[in-house]
Design a protein with these regions (language model features):
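Amphipathic, interface-forming alpha-helical segments with heptad-repeat character
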Residues: 71-85, 89
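Long, amphipathic coiled-coil "stalk"/hairpin helices in large membrane-associated assemblies
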Residues: 58-59, 64, 71, 80
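Acidic-residue sensor for enzyme active/binding pockets
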Residues: 7, 69, 112
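Acidic/glycine-rich phosphate/pyrophosphate-binding loops and surrounding catalytic core
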Residues: 83-141
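A positional/architectural concept
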Residues: 1-60
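Short, Lys/Arg-enriched, disordered terminal segments
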Residues: 1, 141-142
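C-terminal interaction segments
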Residues: 38, 48-50, 66-76
């Protein structure tokens, strides 16, 4: 199977850098799949789950919004955050979910509720990534 280099970069770090067989990303218009020899593309990404296929397996990351550029040579994904399943602590997620639900249920400030809703959405996404692939890990980036 053909392959293409993929890099996923956040403001803090390079979250992923490997040669892959395919990547599937969330966009405002739905999921987009990119294979080697894909036509050039530049698109905005939404918060969601990225599926990466390489080494005969699928791997998942939770990402924040950002952009993807596809060229003949490589795929570059620049996002606000990228979280591997092995970086997620389920107990912390459940606490964050409970805290967010408590804030949302109170008649507090709209701003606090908006932040809590975003936190709740991130918690659900990260929990999905964690449960989807609890026993798989992406290679470490040095």
């Amino acid at each position: 199977m053909n392959s293409i280099p993929l890099e996923i970069i956040t403001p803090q770090r390079k979250a992923f850098s490997e040669t892959v067989n395919a990547v599937f990303v969330p966009t405002a218009n739905g999921r987009v799949g990119v294979l080697p020899r894909h036509i050039g593309l530049f698109t905005a990404l939404t918060e969601g789950e990225v599926r990466i296929t390489y080494g005969g397996k699928d791997w998942y990351l939770a990402i924040g919004g950002g952009f993807m550029e596809v060229t003949k040579e490589k795929i570059s994904i620049l996002v606000s955050r990228a979280v591997h399943a092995d970086e997620i602590n389920e107990a912390d997620l459940k606490k964050a979910e409970k805290d967010a639900r408590d804030i949302i249920s109170q008649k507090g400030k709209t701003e606090e509720r908006t932040v809590a809703l975003a936190s709740l959405r991130r918690s659900f996404l990260e929990l999905k990534v964690l449960r989807h692939h609890k026993h798989r890990q992406l290679p470490s980036i040095s």
